Amino acid sequence: INWKKIAEIGKQVLSAL
């Protein structure tokens, strides 16, 4: 599991809300 990618995607998802 690539936690850095998950963190980046998570930030993008939160900013998209």
From Swiss-Prot:
Domain of life, per lineage: Eukaryota
GO biological process: defense response to bacterium; innate immune response
UniProt tissue specificity: Expressed by the venom gland. This peptide is also found on female cuticle and nest paper. The venom could be the source of these peptides, which could be spread all over the cuticle by the frequent grooming movements of the female wasps.
Any GO CC annotation of this UniProt entry: extracellular region
Main location class: secreted
Subcellular location: Secreted
Leucine amide PTM positions: L17
Swiss-Prot/TrEMBL keywords: Amidation, Antibiotic, Antimicrobial, Immunity, Innate immunity, Secreted
Family per similarity comment: Belongs to the MCD family. Mastoparan subfamily.
Purpose of the protein: Shows antimicrobial activity against the Gram-positive bacteria B.subtilis ATCC 6633 (MIC=2 ug/ml), and the Gram-negative bacteria E.coli JM109 (MIC=8 ug/ml).
Protein name as it appears in the record: Dominulin-B
Species this protein is from: Polistes dominula (European paper wasp)
